């Protein structure tokens, strides 16, 4: 059934999900509608975003009565099937007021931030209309996403949302944007973000060294090997590994 559901078209999906939800109690359907604004659900998160004392019971009911949820390991988290989540989000945008949607995102942002989930917290902060707070939350996390986890698409998506002034106001974001450009061979873009970091005076040898590494990689990937070699030659011997 799930395979058939996954292969269904948009109209068929809407009909299938609508028919499925028609058999739910109204309270459960309303609960699912609000959960549709989340990427994954947890009983404590649901309790945080919904003013219902029985949120945990509704979570259990949703988990037990629908096959369209996938457990995320043994963490207590559940993930909605992408198609039903998309359907619920469309319904939410049509059924819930803008103020209620914003409040759900605001509560999700604050709860997720308290749990240390910077990326998801930032996504909800952005959806709630708090762009500056979202960018501040994600700034340091983006560097790790790029350099340690290789989630280049996620990094590129976040950077594309940020004004240049935000990126240049945060050193971690400048380095992240520089690496993102360098690893794709866009040496001009890499230079745009970190070029000034290799200009004297530069008291921080670690920062200077990493900026040189970014420029060396960007030029090397663009097959500007002579320029890359010059940046490599300038790398300070006392700079720590980045």
Kindly label every feature range from the protein language model:
Residues 14-94, 102-106:
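C-terminal boundary/linker of central alpha/beta nucleotide-binding cores
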Residues 98-193:
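Extended alpha-helical scaffolding segments used for macromolecular assembly and cargo binding
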């Amino acid at each position: 059934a799930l395979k058939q559901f996954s292969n269904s078209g948009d109209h068929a999906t809407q009909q299938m999900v609508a028919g499925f939800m028609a058999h739910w109690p109204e309270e459960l359907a309303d609960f699912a509608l609000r959960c549709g604004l989340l990427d994954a659900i947890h009983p404590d998160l649901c309790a945080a975003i919904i003013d219902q004392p029985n949120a945990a019971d509704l979570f259990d009911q949703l988990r037990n009565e629908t096959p369209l949820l996938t457990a995320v390991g043994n963490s207590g988290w559940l993930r909605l099937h992408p198609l039903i989540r998309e359907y619920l989000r469309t319904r939410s945008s049509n059924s819930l007021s803008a103020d209620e949607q914003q409040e759900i995102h605001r509560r999700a942002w604050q709860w997720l931030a308290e749990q240390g989930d910077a990326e998801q917290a930032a996504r909800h902060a952005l959806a709630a209309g708090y762009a500056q707070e979202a960018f501040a939350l994600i700034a340091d996390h983006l560097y790790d996403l790029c350099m340690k986890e290789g989630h280049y698409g996620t990094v590129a998506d976040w950077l594309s949302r940020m004004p240049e002034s935000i990126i240049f106001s945060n050193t971690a974001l400048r380095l992240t944007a520089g690496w993102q450009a360098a690893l794709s061979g866009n040496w001009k873009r890499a230079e745009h973000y970190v070029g000034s970091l290799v200009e004297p005076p530069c008291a921080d040898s670690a920062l200077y060294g990493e900026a040189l590494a970014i420029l060396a990689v960007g030029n090397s990937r663009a097959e500007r090997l002579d320029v890359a070699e010059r940046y490599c030659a300038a790398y300070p011997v006392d700079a720590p590994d980045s």
